[in-house]
C-alpha cells in the first residue's frame, strides 16, 4: 500500500513558509491505519518495550504494542505524568525542554523500540534515546511513519537502525 497518498500537504501551516505534513487522512482510513500498524509491528517484534512520545507517538506506538502484547511506555513533556518521574532536559533551537517517564517502567537491559509519527531534525528522538539509556534500556530501533529526509534527523542516531514507512523531502 502506498501510504504517501494518505499524507496531505498543508501549505503555510502552522505559519507562513511551513509545508505541514498532515497524517489525518491516514488516521481516517481504516485500511491504511491497519496496514501501518501491521507494518510497524513487523518491524518492532524484537522489542521488550515500545516507547512513544506525546502525542502522536501514542497514535502508532500504543496499537503496535497491543498488537504485539508488549508494554507501551509514554514519554511526556514536564508535568503531564502522575507519580514519581525520571526527567531529562534537552536543548531546543531556542531554549530547553524536559521529557519525563514514570519511574520504574524501564528495567535495565530492556530492548526498546521508539515509535513516532514524523522524524524531522531528530532532537526530541535523541532526547528520548538519552532518557531511556539513562535508565539502562538499550534502544535497538526507531520506527516512523514519515521521515523528512532533507532535515537529516537520522544523523543524530549514529548506527542505530531507523525504519521509515514513508520518506519525503520538504
Swiss-Prot record:
Disulfide bonds: none annotated. The keyword Cytoplasm applies. Pfam families: Pribosyltran (PF00156). Keywords: Cytoplasm, Glycosyltransferase, Purine salvage, Transferase. GO terms for cellular component: cytoplasm. Coiled coil: none annotated. Pathway: Purine metabolism; AMP biosynthesis via salvage pathway; AMP from adenine: step 1/1. This is Adenine phosphoribosyltransferase. It comes from Mycoplasmopsis pulmonis (strain UAB CTIP).
Amino acid at each position: 500500500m502506498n501510504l504517501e497518498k494518505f499524507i496531505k500537504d498543508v501549505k503555510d501551516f502552522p505559519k507562513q513558509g511551513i509545508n505541514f505534513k498532515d497524517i489525518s487522512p491516514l488516521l481516517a482510513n481504516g485500511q491504511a491505519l491497519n496496514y501501518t500498524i501491521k507494518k510497524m509491528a513487523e518491524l518492532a517484534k524484537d522489542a521488550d518495550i515500545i516507547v512513544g512520545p506525546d502525542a502522536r507517538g501514542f497514535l502508532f506506538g500504543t496499537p503496535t504494542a497491543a498488537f504485539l502484547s508488549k508494554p507501551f511506555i509514554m514519554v511526556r513533556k514536564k508535568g503531564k505524568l502522575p507519580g514519581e518521574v525520571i526527567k531529562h532536559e534537552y536543548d531546543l533551537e531556542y531554549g530547553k525542554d524536559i521529557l519525563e517517564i514514570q519511574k520504574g517502567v524501564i528495567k535495565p537491559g530492556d530492548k526498546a523500540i521508539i515509535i513516532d509519527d514524523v522524524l524531522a531534525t531528530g532532537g526530541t528522538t535523541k532526547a528520548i534515546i538519552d532518557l531511556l539509556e539513562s535508565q539502562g534500556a538499550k534502544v535497538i530501533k526507531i520506527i516512523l511513519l514519515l521521515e523528512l529526509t532533507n532535515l537529516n534527523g537520522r544523523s543524530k542516531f549514529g548506527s542505530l537502525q531507523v525504519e521509515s514507512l514513508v520518506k519525503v523531502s520538504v
